[in-house]
């Protein structure tokens, strides 16, 4: 595993340890990587978090997956503790699993927009979560939906969208989410300039929670594309879609309260953030002897494609990625997998919880990337986003 990725994983592990213990080690000399807590301490946290198999998971498979994680995690943590960044592929993948399960960068399931107070990862983030709940994070979560084809569900969908204008029925998502709906599910669309009429069936479900059988579906009928649109770093990866109610649709939820193009959110001046979306099953299959995608699915109960909240920090300013020639992407380290594309980055501890960027991709342990509203306000305003 490449050393830059390992350095970032080590920093995340150290951040989680510092949050649990003020006496945890700080940065190594030269700021190359952060020293994690002693291996045993971190593994104790992981073991506690994974003490009971999730429902509907084969217990034998779960225990085997847990043992693989703990074995490779121990070896990797011992190396990092002594400053050795030469992790093999399985040790590196185990570190990625650890930062999710030990609370360093968790991905919290939501139920009625709330985090389960018994979630084993909640302790590290309890203060922030309490503050976010007081600011109305549950109401904001209600505006986030799963974009899916006809008969869509947690294993059959394309990404995340968020309601930004209830009166006009507008949601914001990525251009590449719309593109994948066409390519992966054959959703027919007709182009007319910078707009797409959705001739096939594409919808958004504003529930999509693991605890609920309810749906809150609206049909996506038209998509507006910004000038210079493109996927990931190859253009402005954004789209504003218009939705219409179905015969059984309830009233739309309240939209997100504020889209912000404040430059402070693109420079790291305000660093704490969170996103709400629908992460899919991870594809961590680059281990040498272990299928880490299988391990992650078993350990976390296959609860993917459902609504989650992931907290994190700002990591990189505009133009940091070599492909970001337009200087429009910022970096963050919240835990995301495919399916979270189209999620809004929120300053979740600020008054009115402003949303300031649109997540479009990345990799756990390196960086995730999001389209900065400060960089592309004019292009987004032209297709219906209000700042």
From Swiss-Prot:
Residue runs in coiled coils: none
A family per Pfam: Trypsin_2
EC number: 3.4.21.-
Presence of the UniProt keyword Protease in the record: yes
Source organism, top-level taxon: Bacteria
GO BP: any one term: defense response to virus
InterPro entries: Peptidase_S1_PA, Peptidase_S1_PA_chymotrypsin
GO molecular function, one term: serine-type peptidase activity
Enzyme class, broadest EC rank: hydrolase
Keywords: Antiviral defense, Hydrolase, Protease, Serine protease
Gene3D superfamilies the UniProt entry points to: Trypsin-like serine proteases
Primary role: Possibly a dedicated protease for substrate gasdermin bGSDM; cleaves the bGSDM precursor, releasing the pore-forming moiety, which integrates into the membrane and triggers cell death. Involved in defense against bacteriophages. When this probable 4 gene operon (bGSDM-FE772_23060-FE772_23065-FE772_23070) is inserted into E.coli it provides nearly 100-fold protection against phages T5 and T6 and about 8-fold against phage T4. The operon without bGSDM no longer protects against phage.
Family per similarity comment: Belongs to the peptidase S1 family.
Protein name: Probable serine protease FE772_23060
């Amino acid at each position: 595993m490449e050393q830059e990725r390992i350095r970032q994983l080590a920093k995340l592990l150290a951040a989680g340890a510092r949050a649990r213990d003020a006496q945890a080690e700080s940065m190594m000399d030269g700021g190359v990587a952060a020293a994690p807590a002693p291996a045993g301490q971190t593994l104790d946290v992981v073991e506690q978090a994974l003490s009971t198999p999730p429902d509907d998971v084969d217990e034998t498979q779960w225990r085997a997956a847990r043992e693989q994680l703990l074995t490779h995690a121990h070896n990797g943590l011992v190396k990092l503790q002594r400053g050795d960044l030469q992790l093999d592929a399985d040790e590196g993948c185990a570190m990625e699993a650890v930062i999710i399960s030990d609370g360093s960068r968790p991905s919290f399931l939501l139920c009625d927009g709330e985090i389960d107070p018994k979630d084993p990862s909640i302790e590290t983030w309890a203060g922030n979560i309490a503050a976010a709940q007081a600011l109305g994070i549950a109401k904001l979560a209600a505006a986030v939906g799963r974009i899916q084809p006809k008969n869509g569900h947690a294993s059959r969908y394309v990404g995340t969208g968020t309601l930004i204008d209830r009166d006009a029925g507008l949601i914001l998502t990525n251009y590449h989410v719309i593109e994948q709906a066409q390519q992966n599910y054959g959703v027919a669309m007709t182009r007319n300039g910078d707009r797409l009429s959705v001739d096939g069936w594409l919808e958004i479900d504003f529930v999509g929670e693991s605890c609920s059988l309810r749906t809150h579906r609206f049909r996506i009928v038209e998509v507006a594309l910004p000038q210079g649109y493109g996927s990931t770093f190859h253009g402005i990866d954004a789209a504003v879609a218009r939705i219409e109610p179905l015969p059984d649709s309830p009233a739309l939820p309240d939209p997100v309260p504020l889209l912000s193009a404040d430059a402070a959110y693109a420079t790291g001046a305000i660093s704490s953030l969170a996103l709400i979306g629908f992460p899919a099953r991870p594809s961590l299959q680059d281990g040498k002897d272990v299928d880490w995608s299988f391990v992650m699915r078993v350990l976390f109960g296959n609860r993917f494609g459902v609504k989650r909240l992931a907290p994190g920090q700002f990591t990189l300013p505009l133009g940091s990625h070599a492909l970001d020639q337009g200087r429009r992407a910022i970096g963050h380290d919240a835990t995301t997998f495919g399916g979270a594309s189209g999620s809004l980055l929120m300053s979740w501890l600020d008054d009115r919880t402003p949303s300031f960027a649109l997540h479009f991709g990345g990799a756990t342990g390196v960086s995730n990337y999001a389209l900065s509203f400060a960089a592309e306000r004019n292009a987004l305003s032209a297709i219906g986003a209000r700042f």
